[in-house]
Amino acid sequence: MGRSLKKGPYVDPKLLKKIRELNEKGEKKIIKTWSRRSVIVPEMVGHTIAVYNGRKHIPVYITENMIGHRLGEFAPTRTFTGHRIPTARITAIK
């Protein structure tokens, strides 16, 4: 189930405060955050937010197409290295 419409989208209060301060000053700095669950709102457009993926912060530039999605969607947490090839097949190929 999604979040109730009467509550509105969840945005981490500290992150929203930082965004509003930068908008007032007219600055564009990279903002580090651990809040992957925060929803992208129109105030964030044009900013770069470094989202933590469990190992490092991934810089995400916010565009209009991202509004309504969550920050965590743009910072993958798992690295896929591919499936293992059986050793018998490797020797047959050579």
UniProtKB/Swiss-Prot annotation:
Q: Which Gene3D superfamilies match?
A: 30s Ribosomal Protein S19, Chain A
Keyword RNA-binding among record annotations: yes
Gene Ontology cellular component annotations, sorted alphabetically? cytoplasm; small ribosomal subunit
Q: Which domain of life is it from?
A: Bacteria
Q: Which UniProt keywords apply?
A: Ribonucleoprotein, Ribosomal protein, RNA-binding, rRNA-binding
What's a GO biological-process term for it? ribosomal small subunit assembly
Transmembrane region positions?
Answer: none
What Gene Ontology molecular function terms does this protein carry?
Answer: rRNA binding; structural constituent of ribosome
Instruction: State the function annotated in the UniProt record.
Output: Protein S19 forms a complex with S13 that binds strongly to the 16S ribosomal RNA.
* Annotated NCBIfam families: rpsS_bact (TIGR01050)
User: What is stated as this protein's family in its record?
Assistant: Belongs to the universal ribosomal protein uS19 family.
Q: What is this protein called?
A: Small ribosomal subunit protein uS19
The organism encoding this protein is Dictyoglomus turgidum (strain DSM 6724 / Z-1310)
Q: Which gene encodes it?
A: rpsS
